[in-house]
């Protein structure tokens, strides 16, 4: 089978275009096989006796993350909660600028939002976010200051289910629940016709119907990230939506733009809002890459940011993207 030769063949057998701007408004649809469900016997997570302690909740489910690394991440409750009432944790890190402008004022920090475990059964996505928190903390300076915001586990209910689940506690695929154009029409049709009502891809009863997707939507509206990094597994590719020239690789992951779905984060952020969205698909949902690969992906991301997003002191930053930005051509 082709899927055995290339995991990406399972992800995007073909892209169907509807022509002109209608394709952008409705989303570029993909016919996809059901997402692989990682099969593994996992330890039962710690009881929720200390709801403000992220490590007490998540540590037993984090591949390649020990107690020391988890504690060092210093995750704190954001104030928002999942559908089942679990805290949504985050961590902000500020990397200072190495230089100032000629006028003696530092450029405004670049805002970067890193999100893991949108799908609760993609455990390595949360672990990678925690590893990257450690790397961000060690950074001395960058050419422009960077305000990092990490949300390692957006879907804690799926992440901590007895068997980790792609969907949240109400059975909703959070990555199909964002308010993209014509969602009410296109998301149900896509789910019924393209996925054959795959329960792992149910978009929900309405856009932003879930507390977790509402929280992320609020972050994108108030934090106004100039880059969103969305971490997934296990297709082993790099995807990109939105303005700017995309990175060609992060570590071993090579760019292969797979299109957007009704209600997806890439569609909402990259196409509709004009925020660059880098989507990382790790090779495995349960096994972390080697440390050298984790560092290589991070270094490649920083190099791309330096080349495409950061601004030299003598070069004024471009105007912010309009909220209704659309790319000039359809993918």
Describe each PLM feature range.
Residues 15-34:
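Sec-dependent N-terminal signal peptides
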Residues 27-29, 36-91:
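Short glycine- and acidic-rich boundary segments immediately preceding or forming the N-terminal edge
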Residues 37-49, 315-331:
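Compositionally biased, proline/threonine/alanine/serine-rich low-complexity intrinsically disordered stretches
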Residues 45-46, 111-116:
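Acidic/histidine-rich, surface-exposed loop or edge segments in extracytoplasmic proteins
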Residues 90-108:
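Short beta-strand-to-loop junctions in surface cap/lid or active-site-entrance loops
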Residues 109, 113, 122-258:
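Active-site/substrate-binding loop(s) of hydrolase catalytic cores
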Residues 237-241, 249-250, 262-323:
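Active-site-adjacent mobile loop/cap segments within catalytic or ligand-binding domains
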């Amino acid at each position: 089978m082709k899927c055995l030769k290339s995991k990406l063949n399972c992800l995007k057998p073909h892209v169907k275009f509807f022509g002109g701007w209608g394709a952008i408004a409705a989303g570029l649809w993909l016919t996809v096989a059901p997402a692989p469900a990682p099969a593994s016997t996992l330890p039962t997570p710690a009881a929720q006796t200390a709801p403000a302690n992220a490590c007490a909740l998540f540590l037993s489910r984090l591949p390649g993350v020990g107690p020391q690394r988890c504690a060092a991440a210093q995750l704190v409750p954001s104030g928002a909660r999942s559908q089942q009432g679990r805290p949504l944790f985050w961590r902000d890190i500020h990397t200072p600028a190495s230089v100032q402008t000629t006028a003696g004022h530092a450029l405004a920090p670049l805002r970067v939002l890193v999100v893991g475990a949108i799908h609760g059964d993609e455990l390595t996505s949360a672990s990678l976010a925690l590893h990257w928190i450690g790397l961000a903390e060690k950074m001395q300076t960058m050419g422009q200051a960077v305000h990092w915001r990490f949300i390692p586990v957006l879907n804690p209910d799926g992440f901590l289910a007895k068997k980790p689940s792609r969907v949240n506690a109400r059975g909703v695929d959070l990555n199909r629940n964002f308010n993209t154009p014509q969602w009410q029409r296109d998301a149900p049709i896509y789910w019924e016709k393209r996925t054959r009502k795959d329960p792992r891809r149910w978009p929900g009863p309405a856009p932003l119907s879930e507390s977790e997707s509402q929280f992320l939507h609020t972050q994108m509206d108030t934090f106004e990230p100039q880059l969103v990094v969305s971490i997934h597994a296990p297709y082993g590719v790099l995807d990109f939506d939105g303005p700017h020239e995309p990175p060609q690789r992060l570590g071993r992951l090579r760019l292969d733009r797979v299109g957007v779905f009704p209600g997806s984060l890439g569609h909402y952020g990259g196409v509709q809002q004009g925020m660059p969205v880098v989507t990382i698909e790790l090779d495995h949902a349960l096994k972390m890459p080697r440390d050298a690969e984790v560092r290589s992906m991070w270094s490649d991301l920083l190099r791309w940011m330096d080349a495409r997003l950061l601004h030299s002191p003598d070069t004024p930053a471009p105007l912010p993207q309009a909220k209704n930005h659309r790319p000039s051509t359809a993918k």
